[in-house]
From Swiss-Prot:
Coiled coil: 336-362
Region ranges (Interaction with BBS1, BBS8 and BBS9): 1-157
GO annotation, cellular component aspect: centrosome; cytoplasm; photoreceptor connecting cilium; photoreceptor outer segment
Domain IQ: 294-317, 318-338, 387-416, 417-437
Keyword terms of this UniProt record: Calmodulin-binding, Cilium biogenesis/degradation, Coiled coil, Cytoplasm, Cytoskeleton, Repeat
Source organism of this protein record: Mus musculus
Protein name, entry field: IQ calmodulin-binding motif-containing protein 1
Task of the protein: Involved in ciliogenesis. The function in an early step in cilia formation depends on its association with CEP290/NPHP6. Involved in regulation of the BBSome complex integrity, specifically for presence of BBS2 and BBS5 in the complex, and in ciliary targeting of selected BBSome cargos. May play a role in controlling entry of the BBSome complex to cilia possibly implicating CEP290/NPHP6.
Source organism, top-level taxon: Eukaryota
Region Interaction with CEP290, BBS1, BBS2, BBS4, BBS5, BBS7, BBS8 and BBS9: start-end pairs: 287-598
Lineage, uppermost ranks: Eukaryota, Metazoa, Chordata, Craniata, Vertebrata
Ranges where the record places region Interaction with BBS1, BBS2, BBS4, BBS7, BBS8 and BBS9: 530-598
UniProt keyword annotation of Coiled coil present: yes
Subcellular location: Cytoplasm, Cytoskeleton, Microtubule organizing center, Centrosome
Length: 598
């Protein structure tokens, strides 16, 4: 439902987006930045503008544009980076109202995922770029996208868990480029400063991957900026979460971490943070002797195990290489097929979504045009008809859904009923066969003989019945007379039925003619609108009827035009005679519909 009192700038912009072709939509959406910047920050007017932008689906248009290829968008990465800023500013501080569930569960996660995908695309373009100016521009656009993502996460903290669990974020974190890596590490540090508790809510595999990447950058990256940021991140995590500190201390994955950190060169930039981290990872109480024994035993076990594994691996090396190559090629083929399938599905989904939006827009425009064409007095009737049609459609779908649901619920009982009928039929057939066999093999007992007394009694009953009901006898002459009367009555009935049928057909024809005449009279225009051709529609095809009508018309005219002294002795019901010559002359010029003039 569109809000009342919509900002005219948003309204005109939405109309322009709806009417413009697809390639011009991104540039038109950039006008939202000027509207947002001209509105006072933190005011109720800004909230109202954001609500209008959301209600007119402009945020969804921005998401659709961000999911497209940058080469197809006018302005390229510059337009895309500005759209990310617009999208993040519109989503932060927005109150969706009734559509809150869709906004928080679908739109916001989709926006964060699109930002990460854009970051990966920019990372790829930055690595493939050869010119320094191009790399500087791409790095600037990447920084804008990360800032927009951080702004979005600052307004919606629940998205931090989705971002940290995303594979795209992990790929961004695993980059070898110093500049991109520094930006991503700074983004991660800012995210954890907002709310680091979401890091413990993610899956264990994702948490280990993030910690491994931070430790890798701390121990292997030559850049002091990245190493300093990684040290600060580990220090913040270890100080704020006891679980992560225990994991870094006791987990077998991070064994020897303290010794590696002690070997790091103490730079003046982050030596203090590094020393604090080493102090946190060193346990206050531990038994050095037992640890040394355990260490020696572990080294011995590892040596034997590694030797066994090495010998086993050397034996399987030729076949393992072939299997590895085969599995790598098959995995790569599957990945390519999966990527192509996902891309095709995404393109199809976007195409269908655009088609649905375009169809909805055309439907709304046609409805508005129809309302403009309809007379104001018929608008309420038109709306009522549309409501009835909509109600009928809803009822049809609801009844279909209800019947399908009832059928699914009744299917087990129907199956049981059919099975019971089948069993009953089989049992009845079996019992009938059994009875038939019994009758075939039953012994013959013979008929019971009648006694003399019983035979006399039955003969007396038959004689009494014959006496009470004597048969009627008719002579041949009486029979012929009765037959002649029946034939006469039958002939009379058939003749009367034919006459009645003709009379009924005549009555139906007269009723149809009367209905046609009434319909013509109802559709006849008023005297003010008549043009002179209308009387021809009321001429009869029957000459007697036309003559009678003409005679009545002339009688009325003659009576009206007669002087008053001729009307003194007349009664209201008296008829006036008309000469036949006047009637015949006029009839000669009378047009009879359906006939040709002589």
């Amino acid at each position: 439902m569109k809000p009342a009192g919509t900002d005219p700038r948003i309204l005109s912009l939405a109309a322009e987006v709806a009417k413009s072709p697809e390639q011009n939509v991104p540039v038109i959406l950039l006008k939202l930045k000027e509207i947002i910047n001209n509105t006072p920050l933190g005011s109720s007017e800004l909230k109202k503008v954001k609500q209008d932008i959301y209600c007119y689906d402009l945020i969804q248009y921005c998401l659709l544009v961000l999911s497209q290829d940058s080469s197809r968008i006018q302005g390229g990465w510059s337009t895309i980076s500005q759209l990310t800023q617009i999208l993040s500013h519109c989503c932060v501080g927005l109150e969706p109202g009734e559509d809150g569930e869709e906004f928080y569960k679908e739109l916001l996660p989709s926006a964060a995922e699109n930002f990460l995908i854009l970051g990966r695309r920019l990372q790829t373009c930055f690595i493939n770029a050869t010119k320094g100016e191009e790399q500087d521009k791409l790095l600037h656009f990447f920084q804008i996208v990360t800032d927009s993502l951080f702004w979005l996460l600052g307004g919606h903290v629940q998205l931090i868990q989705n971002v940290l669990q995303s594979d795209h974020f992990l790929h961004l974190l695993q980059t070898d480029n110093v500049q991109i890596g520094a930006s991503v590490m700074t983004l991660l540090q800012n995210i954890l400063q907002i709310n680091s508790g979401n890091l413990l809510k993610i899956e264990g595999k994702a948490l280990h991957s993030i910690l491994d990447e931070i430790l890798f950058k701390l121990l292997s990256t030559p850049s002091p900026v990245i190493r300093s940021t990684a040290t600060k991140l580990l220090l913040v995590l270890a100080e704020s979460h006891q679980e992560i500190l225990i994991l870094l201390r006791l987990s077998a994955c991070y064994k020897g971490l303290r010794s590696l950190l002690n070997k790091q060169e103490t730079l003046t930039e982050f030596s203090r943070e590094l020393r604090q981290l080493v102090d946190l990872l060193t346990p206050k109480i531990h038994q050095e002797v037992e640890e040394q024994k355990l260490h020696k035993a572990a080294c011995l076990i590892q040596a034997y195990w590694k030797g066994f594994q090495t010998r086993k691996r050397l034996k399987k090396l030729p076949s393992a290489v072939i299997a590895l190559q085969r599995s790598f090629r098959s995995k790569r083929t599957k990945m390519m097929l999966e990527l192509n399938r996902q891309k095709e599905e995404e393109d199809l989904r976007l195409k269908l979504q655009l088609q649905r939006q375009r169809a909805m827009r055309l439907s709304r425009e046609s409805r508005l045009n129809m309302l403009e064409i309809i007379h104001p007095g018929q608008v309420e009737k038109y709306n009522r008809e549309m409501e009835e049609k909509s109600a009928l459609t809803i009822q049809k779908h609801w009844r279909g859904y209800r019947e399908r649901k009832n059928f699914r619920q009744q299917r087990p009982s129907l199956t049981e009923y059919k099975a019971a009928v089948t069993l009953q039929r089989a049992v009845l057939k079996f019992l009938a066969k059994c009875r038939k066999k019994k009758k075939l093999f039953a012994s013959w007992h013979g008929l019971q003989e009648l006694t003399d007394a019983r035979r006399v009694e039955l003969k007396q009953q038959v004689d009494d019945y014959v006496k009470r009901h004597p048969c009627s006898q008719m002579s041949e002459a009486a029979s012929r007379e009765l037959h002649a009367q029946a034939q006469e009555r039958l002939q009379h009935y058939f003749m009367g039925r034919a006459i009645e049928e003709r009379a009924q057909q005549h009555r139906e024809a007269l009723m149809a003619q009367i209905s046609t005449n009434i319909e013509q009279l109802m559709k006849a225009p008023s005297l003010k609108e008549a043009e002179g051709k209308e009387p021809e529609q009321f001429l009869s095809r029957s000459r007697p009827v036309a003559a009678k009508a003409k005679q009545a018309h002339l009688t009325t005219l003659k009576h009206i035009q007669a002087p008053w002294w001729k009307k003194l002795g007349e009664e209201p019901g008296d008829e006036v005679d008309v000469p036949k010559d006047e009637l015949s002359i006029d009839l000669g010029m009378l047009f009879i519909g359906g006939t040709k003039p002589p």
